[in-house]
Amino acid sequence: MSSHFRSFGSRSLYGVVLGLSALTLPGCGDHKAASQVESAPKVMLLNGDDQPLREDFNRDQGFVRLMVVVDPICPECLRGLADMGDDVLAKLPKEARIKVYVVHEPVIGGSDKDIPAAAELLHTTLAHHYWNPTGDFGRQMSQVLGLLHGSSPVFAWDIYMIYPPNAVWSGKGPPQPSYLMHQLPGLDNQKFPPWDGKLFATKVSDILAISDPKN
């Protein structure tokens, strides 16, 4: 897929990364060295069929599922992950029926070696981490979500999504989430609310409460 994606926005674009050129990429600031993680998470390579993410997603039916797409060195993405850890995951009860998937893409030059430090911000070992070096997942998710700046597609990254327990990944692309927040300038903020960790936490709690079989 290619080239009709464009770049715009207040973040500076750092250039072409593995075929992501001409995407709408609001870029991030300079990467600062992060602390080493004592126990590095397992990072799975995402293939052209979105495996093993697709298999994991469908296996986890019955759970509320959170999916995050980031570059592991983007400062705004790292802030989003930190908010996710502090405002959402750290405050959930231990028995919460929830799964977390984080797809990392090299939008501004991040690599799989940067994932452990980014993963540490979530304060949990329960998240599944995937590395998508081609950026194909971001293009695919952009189409699924209908991310547009005017008439131009916006590459999907720095996005935070909630899927209900009954969501099934049956088509070629991922299913539509029930809720999405983002940190991408230029999107319709009425349709796609900008990232707010505390509000996202409220939405997660609401969906957990609705789906709790004891309620």
What do the PLM-derived regions correspond to, one by one?
Residues 1-10:
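N-terminal secretory signal peptides that target proteins for export/translocation
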Residues 12-24:
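Bacterial N-terminal signal peptides
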Residues 28-56, 76-79:
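N-terminal "domain-start" segment that seeds a small globular fold
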Residues 59-75:
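Short active-site neighborhood of thiol/selenol oxidoreductases, capturing the structured segment around
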Residues 72-76, 105-110, 133-138, 167-169:
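Solvent-exposed loop/turn segments at secondary-structure junctions
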Residues 78-120:
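Structural microenvironment flanking redox-active thiols in thiol-disulfide oxidoreductases
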Residues 119-153:
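Short, internal strand/loop/helix patches
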Residues 155-215:
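Thiol-/selenol-based redox modules, centered on thioredoxin-like
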